């Protein structure tokens, strides 16, 4: 099966509309990703077909949330190689996207991806979530925070919820372990001003992978002491 067919049929399987032009943007993204991956560690997934499924379709599955609209301000926290933020921006061009990562080289890669795929309204921020989340330029400025980061949920919410404005949403992608992590994260979610409003189980097309999407609504402001200093959330999670 051709790569464009994997994307087209996979998107249909997820009930997501995607145009030929958007498919071409994603394929261009894949080319740049695999080229840069030769010189720096961006992804362990190197087969073209797997990039389509495990990176692109997985990222696009966030669109299954009834709370994610076609426009608004979004920040991808700890974006790494751009997932899920860049595929979401390609599929939802009305989104204003901020990509946050702590590694300068990854930001340089993302700048090239967005230039080559002609993505506008993208802001690149080099820094740690704990520091940027305390900046008045970014704190509680976003309709959506998204993350596919590997931290435990009670840590991830401290990284992400401070960026979300009251009435906005944190859309978190995790594996099956999210079911076990949720009870441990309930206090952190509440303390940081959030409330779980949606849980979705996603069977990823062309794979045997099941992922989960957790949507947390920001119902009140995050107390000013959060996020705590860099390293503190992961060493001493809110419990």
Swiss-Prot record:
InterPro entries (alphabetical): rRNA_ssu_MeTfrase_G (IPR003682), SAM-dependent_MTases_sf (IPR029063)
Source domain of life: Bacteria
GO molecular function: rRNA (guanine-N7-)-methyltransferase activity
Location in the cell: Cytoplasm
Key word Ligase present: no
Enzyme class: transferase
Residues reported in the UniProt entry to bind S-adenosyl-L-methionine: 78, 83, 129-130, 148
GO terms under cellular component: cytosol
SUPFAM superfamilies: S-adenosyl-L-methionine-dependent methyltransferases
EC number(s) on file: 2.1.1.-
Keywords: Cytoplasm, Methyltransferase, rRNA processing, S-adenosyl-L-methionine, Transferase
Family per similarity comment: Belongs to the methyltransferase superfamily. RNA methyltransferase RsmG family.
Function: Specifically methylates the N7 position of a guanine in 16S rRNA.
UniProt-recorded name of the protein: Ribosomal RNA small subunit methyltransferase G
Organism: Alkaliphilus oremlandii (strain OhILAs)
